[in-house]
Amino acid sequence: MACTFEQILETIENLTVKELNELVKLFEEKFDVSAQPTVVAGAAGGAAGGAGEEKTEFDVILKDAGAKKINVIKVVRQITGAGLKEAKEIVDGAPSTIKEAVSKEEAEEIKKQLEEAGATVEVK
């Protein structure tokens, strides 16, 4: 029984955030690859030498949900588009990454929303 690419994509589309994370880890182990972007040697040297350069991509990390956990789950659902179960798993698994490689403005907006809901957030 052969699967078509469309069937594979449809299956992947229906995975939760947690399941997608596990799938990526399995790919990394099975094929001995990394999901991390490759850094060009010249670019790394330039970034280290130029302390004045501003970072353009940021990760938003939920450190703690705080006392208003339900409000934080609602905001996480809104931001990530995850279902209730997935959003709860993200919040319960803190510290966890909410969004990766977003602009500074988007990262600050997400941080503001989560902090207003009662969470402790870090932007890296």
Swiss-Prot record:
Coiled-coil segments: none
Domain of life the protein comes from: Bacteria
GO cellular component: cytosolic large ribosomal subunit
Alphabetically ordered keywords of this record: Ribonucleoprotein, Ribosomal protein
InterPro entries (UniProt xref): Ribosomal_bL12 (IPR000206), Ribosomal_bL12_C (IPR013823), Ribosomal_bL12_C/ClpS-like (IPR014719), Ribosomal_bL12_oligo (IPR008932), Ribosomal_bL12_oligo_N_sf (IPR036235)
A biological-process GO annotation: translation
A molecular-function term among this protein's GO annotations: mRNA binding
UniProt xrefs under Pfam families: Ribosomal_L12, Ribosomal_L12_N
Record carries keyword Ribosomal protein: yes
Assembly notes: Homodimer. Part of the ribosomal stalk of the 50S ribosomal subunit. Forms a multimeric L10(L12)X complex, where L10 forms an elongated spine to which 2 to 4 L12 dimers bind in a sequential fashion. Binds GTP-bound translation factors.
Function as written in the Swiss-Prot or TrEMBL entry: Forms part of the ribosomal stalk which helps the ribosome interact with GTP-bound translation factors. Is thus essential for accurate translation.
Sequence similarity: Belongs to the bacterial ribosomal protein bL12 family.
Name by which UniProt lists this protein: Large ribosomal subunit protein bL12
Organism (species): Nautilia profundicola (strain ATCC BAA-1463 / DSM 18972 / AmH)
